[in-house]
């Protein structure tokens, strides 16, 4: 482990709210772009995450937690509202104006006596809207006064997340409950190349196997280690926060949650809908509230479950909260159970999907997908396979962040040496349906949609997905999905960016999250 990483509108409170001195504090920790399998608690051998592991060892390690949408803003929208992307109007998309009609759970906690604060990344990118002429506070007042003496690497933030949490604890009334959002900006790109070996003390040989959808090279192994170092940085700040809670005697009645918003910022990860995209790390610790700590739970958990859970532990009835209805379920039954493995047999699937992420397609189009995960299978339906799933090549595949891994795959493709990795990460889908056996193919490389032996299983999952989307009135499923492409962006230049760029009216300077070399010189279709 890198040593502390070098430094480190109101509503009426319902009658059911518990007495203030018994309501737990909540510390919600969310990384930026980390996949499920890269916490050491899950067996990763090239990252060390002792703080996450402590939550797992003294609380619950969730094996099957999923974000409904593997991109920053829409994923965080689901967390805040308890609703799936297709239930959130503009907030289904990335870089948007947050709809006024959707109350967030921190707003509800605040209205019911909770003191709230945040540090680091909250909801975004996008604009929260206004209340009484002032920016709406979707999460909480930001605590950002404390900074590290030196950035650990050129790619990391210099924010002292743990220091800002300490400032929050010093300011609040210790007799009243609180909610704090710790939004690490790591492991979001960009990384300092080679930092994983140089500062993290790791070797590229520590990585036993590179995912099959990337070439195995020294460059890519270094890219993975650099990503792992940033995960460790996020974890180290959580460790300091836990120590502070212990010193203050607050740990016993604090629910601590650690997860990530979406998968790793690599090709075929973040912004897609595969295991490396949507399957999230999740551990929770609450000494006073979780029975039989040290359990591993296999229930299917969705990010839409967070809001109902947090209101439940705070003694607030969801139906009295003023929030829009949620398909999520409180996890209090899991906390109160002593069971290992599957706790609630009804919690056996989650639904996922995506609409528009970044702005690299004609007509402001997204790449719509809906899917369902359960019983070790993943079913996906790609609505528009004539579109480029990672964004148009002539605009740099904007849905995939620039990186050494992306560059290497593009170079292999352009040189004619190997196009297979490009097809997996950037090529157009060959069929509307994708179906994967996750137990035997967690990398989602072998599409079994046409395997007759699994036809019945696939049809059952598709039927369950369709029934869920119909019940939730998904515009895409009901035939009005183009509404998602008509919603505006919170950044004016993004509207019709494709057309404006192709006409020479916009430049690559607007797309700093990719490399200039990611752009193909001409359209590929």
Protein language model regions, located:
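Universal eukaryotic N-terminal targeting presequences
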Residues: 1-2
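C-terminal structured "cap/appendage" subdomains that terminate the fold
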Residues: 467, 471, 475-480
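Short, charged, surface-exposed hinge/linker loops at domain edges
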Residues: 477-491
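Extracellular, beta-strand-rich glycan-interacting domains
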Residues: 438-440
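Formylglycine-dependent sulfatase
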Residues: 5-10, 16-428, 433, 442-463, ...
């Amino acid at each position: 482990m890198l040593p502390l990483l070098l430094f480190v509108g109101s509503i009426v409170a319902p009658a059911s709210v518990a007495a203030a001195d018994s309501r737990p504090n909540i510390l919600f920790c969310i990384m930026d772009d980390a996949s499920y399998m890269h916490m050491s608690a899950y067996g990763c051998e090239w990252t060390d995450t002792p703080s996450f592991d402590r939550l797992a060892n003294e609380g619950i390690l969730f094996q099957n937690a999923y974000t409904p949408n593997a991109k920053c803003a829409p994923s965080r929208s689901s967390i805040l509202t308890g609703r799936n992307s297709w239930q959130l109007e503009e907030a289904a998309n990335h870089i948007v104006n947050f709809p006024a009609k959707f109350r967030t759970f921190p707003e509800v906690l605040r209205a019911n006596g909770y003191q709230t604060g945040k540090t680091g990344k909250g909801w975004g990118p996008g604009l929260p809207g206004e209340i009484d002429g002032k920016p709406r506070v979707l999460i909480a007042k930001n605590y950002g006064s404390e900074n590290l003496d030196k950035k650990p690497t050129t790619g990391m933030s210099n924010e002292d997340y743990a220091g800002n949490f300490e400032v929050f604890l010093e300011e609040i009334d210790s007799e009243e409950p609180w909610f704090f959002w710790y939004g690490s900006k790591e492991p979001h790109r960009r990384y300092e190349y080679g930092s994983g070996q140089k500062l993290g003390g790791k070797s590229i040989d520590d990585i036993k196997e590179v995912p099959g959808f990337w070439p195995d090279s020294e460059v890519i192994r270094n890219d993975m280690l650099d990503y792992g170092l940033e995960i460790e940085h996020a974890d180290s700040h959580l460790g300091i926060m836990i120590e502070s809670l212990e010193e203050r005697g607050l740990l016993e009645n604090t629910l601590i949650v650690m997860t990530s918003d979406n998968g790793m910022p690599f090709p075929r990860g973040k912004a897609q809908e595969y295991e490396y995209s949507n399957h999230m790390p999740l551990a929770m610790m609450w000494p006073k509230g979780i029975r039989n700590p040290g359990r591993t739970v296999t229930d299917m958990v969705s990010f839409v479950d967070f809001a109902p859970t947090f209101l439940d532990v705070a003694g607030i009835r969801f139906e009295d909260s003023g929030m829009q209805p949620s398909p999520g379920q409180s996890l209090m039954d899991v906390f109160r159970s002593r069971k290992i493995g599957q706790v609630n047999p009804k919690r056996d699937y989650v639904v996922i999907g995506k609409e528009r992420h970044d702005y690299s397609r004609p007509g402001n189009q997204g790449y719509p997908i809906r899917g369902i995960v359960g019983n070790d299978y993943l079913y996906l339906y790609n609505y528009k396979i004539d579109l480029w799933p990672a964004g148009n090549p002539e605009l740099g595949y904007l849905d995939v962040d620039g990186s050494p891994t992306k560059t290497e795959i593009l170079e292999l493709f352009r040189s004619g040496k190997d196009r297979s990795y490009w097809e997996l990460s950037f090529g157009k889908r060959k069929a509307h349906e994708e179906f994967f056996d996750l137990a035997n193919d967690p990398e989602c490389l072998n599409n079994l949609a046409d395997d007759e032996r699994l036809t019945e299983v696939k049809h059952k999952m598709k039927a369950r997905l369709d029934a869920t989307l119909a019940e939730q009135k998904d515009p895409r499923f009901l035939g009005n999905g183009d509404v998602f492409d008509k919603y505006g962006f919170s950044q004016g230049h993004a509207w019709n960016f494709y057309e404006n760029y192709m006409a020479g009216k916009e430049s690559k300077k607007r797309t700093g999250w990719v490399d200039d070399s990611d752009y193909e010189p001409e359209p590929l279709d």
